C-alpha cells in the first residue's frame, strides 16, 4: 500500500486489489461509518474507493481521481443517508438523548492535551497513574495520553502498539515501535481566554483566526493533467504537513507562545486564538513564510479573523471567522491573498 496524499481531513491511498480485499474494504467502510455515527452522530464521508488498472494510473490518472472525488461529493451532499437508514429505530425510540456518549471522554481529553507529549495507540487499554485512555467509536483501538513521568518502558501489548512522539524525543529509551510527528502548539500549557484579551489601541478583544490554502485542488488537477509522477502528490502532502505543523510550531514557540493558542494546525488549514494584535501579526508572518515556501506553486492563503470578548462562545467566534474567510476567498484578484475581519 502507498499513501499518495494525506493532509488535513483527507487522504488518498493505493491498495492492491482482488475480490477478497474489496469485500473486506467494503465491510470495513460500513463498520467504520456505523461506529462513527453511533459515537458522534456524524458520517465519515471520505471513505470511498474506485478500482483502477496499473496502466490507467500510469497513463491517465486524473479521470480515476475525478471519479473518486465525485463519489466523495455524492456522500457529502447526501449526509447521513446510510446511517439514518441503519439507525432509524434508534432515532425514533422514546427517551433517547442526542448527547454523544463520548462527550465526557472528549472533555477530559481536551483538558489534558496541553500537558501531554505522547500518544500511545494500542489494541489493549493501558492503565496507569494520571493516564487518560479512550476508545473512540469502540473499534478496538485505544489512544492513551502520556507525559514523560508515566511513559512506560515496556508493556504487554508492545507488538500491536505504536507510540506517537510529538515535536521532540524523550530522554528515556523506548523499546517498542514509535514515530516522531510534529504538532503545532502541542505539549504546552494553555492560557485562559481572559489572559488572551489585548487592550492595545483601546480595543479589548481576543482574535480568532481561520486560514486555509487556496487553489490546492486546481494545482493537483493540473499535476494530474501534466502526468506528473504519483510520488509528487505524496511529496506535496508532506510539504504542506511540515509547514502547518513543524514550521508554525517553531515560530509559535519563538514569538507567540505567551499570547496565542494554536487550536489546530495541520494539512492545509489552521485555527488559532489569542491577543488580537498578535493574531494579526502571526497571520502576516504565516502568509509571508507560506509565499517563500511555496513560491513555485500556484497556491495562496486566505484568512478570516473575528474580534470577540473572552466570554463570547468560541464556536460562534470560529463560525464568524470562517464566514470572513469565505469573503476573503472571493477577493477576486489573481495572485493576491485576502484577509477579512469581523469585529
Label each residue range with its predicted role.
Residues 1-343:
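Regulatory and interdomain segments flanking nucleotide-handling catalytic cores
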